[in-house]
């Protein structure tokens, strides 16, 4: 619910300019070694080329893989051209996805605070910088390095 279309646009530009089969925002992709900076969980965004989707359609036999596609691609990681966007600050401790009532309460609080504006990731970061107590709603802990230089 806290999706940022600007990051999606950046991801599409990266994927199309580099002719990638798969591109993603760094959230939690254990296949890539050495990456430590992550976007907030819930800001997930992926680009999958038609070529990769067709390969998954032809190669995936497990019902789970046929439904979700990405796990099959992850297991065949070496055969695809891939890339990612990594943030300049590590936001991996932030949880913006909705899996529990507390997560929903957090997202609702963010929406209430940012009501009336077409907000992006930076607006949410700015809000949480001003009101870090919002993070406590779903058990997040504020880290000073999350303050984004404007």
Language-model regions, residue ranges each:
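Short, flexible, basic/aromatic active-site loop/helix in glycosyltransferases
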Residues: 20-35, 51-55, 74-84
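Conserved alpha/beta core of the MobA/IspD/sugar-nucleotide pyrophosphorylase nucleotidyltransferase superfamily
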Residues: 67-150
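A residue-level structural signature of the nucleotidyltransferase/glycosyltransferase Rossmann-like core
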Residues: 45, 61-62, 95-96
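Short aromatic/basic micro-patch
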Residues: 2, 47, 97-98
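A recurrent flexible, glycine/aromatic-enriched loop bordering the glycosyltransferase active site
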Residues: 32-45, 89-90
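Conserved catalytic/acceptor-binding region of the Class I
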Residues: 52, 56-73
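Conserved nucleotide-sugar donor-binding
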Residues: 45-57, 101-105
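Conserved donor-nucleotide/metal-binding helix-loop-beta segment in metal-dependent transferases, i.e.
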Residues: 1-38
């Amino acid at each position: 619910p806290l999706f940022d279309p600007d990051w999606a646009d950046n991801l599409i530009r990266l994927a199309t300019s580099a002719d990638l089969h798969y591109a993603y925002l760094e959230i939690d992709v254990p296949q890539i070694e050495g990456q430590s900076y992550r976007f907030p969980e819930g800001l997930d965004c992926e680009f999958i080329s038609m070529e990769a989707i067709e390969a998954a359609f032809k190669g995936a036999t497990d019902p789970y893989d046929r439904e979700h596609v990405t796990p099959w691609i992850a297991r065949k990681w070496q055969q695809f051209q891939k890339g990612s966007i990594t943030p300049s600050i590590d936001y991996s401790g932030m949880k913006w996805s909705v899996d529990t009532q507390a997560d929903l309460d957090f997202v609702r609080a963010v929406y209430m605070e940012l009501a009336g504006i077409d907000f992006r990731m930076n607006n949410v970061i700015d809000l949480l910088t001003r009101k870090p107590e919002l993070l406590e709603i779903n058990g997040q802990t504020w880290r000073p390095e999350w303050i984004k230089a404007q």
